[in-house]
Amino acid sequence: MSRLKSIVFISGNGSNLQNIIDNIASDYLKMDIVAVISNNANAQGLVRAKASGIETIVIDTKDKYVDKLLVVMDAFEIDLIILSGFMKILPEEFIKKYYGKIINIHPSLLPKFKGLDTHKKVLASKEEYHGASVHFVTSKLDGGPIIVQGKTKILKNDDEDILKS
């Protein structure tokens, strides 16, 4: 079985990226990360990627960036794009070009709590469980088909920081 060539998009700390890197190193995940792309030049996840010998690319997303992004993507023959804490909505043109190859790691049990501030929303709603979803990316925000979910019981003293971890 050949290994998937993947690119991971991040914006921040890169804790999910580190989990992916660790699971690749243990051969649990049969893939290779060929690059990590971030819209934040100061993202700690870029340090994690560099420490693992993974190429890093910073793309300024303040203006129209789809052309720059497509040039970068065309340089790689990728099988999978993983959005791992990437805090920008991808342009429709990009989603169409890579449809079926883009997955997102979202910190809620979709279809509940789409978008931002999921941990706060879960606590405010007094949910019994919280978790994460991996889903295919479509033009609908956090609305693509769900691939897998993991859940955990919310304990009495849990707060946003605990749920994030």
Where are these regions (language model features)?
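Conserved acidic residues
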Residues: 34, 79, 100
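N-terminal glycine-rich "phosphate-gripper" loop used for MgATP/nucleotide binding
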Residues: 38, 61-62, 76-92
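Residue-level detector of anion-binding/catalytic polar loops
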Residues: 55, 79, 128
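Short, surface-exposed acidic-centric catalytic microdomains
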Residues: 29-68
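Donor/substrate-binding cores of folate-linked one-carbon enzymes
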Residues: 23, 84-165
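Short, well-structured alpha-helical segments in soluble
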Residues: 67-76
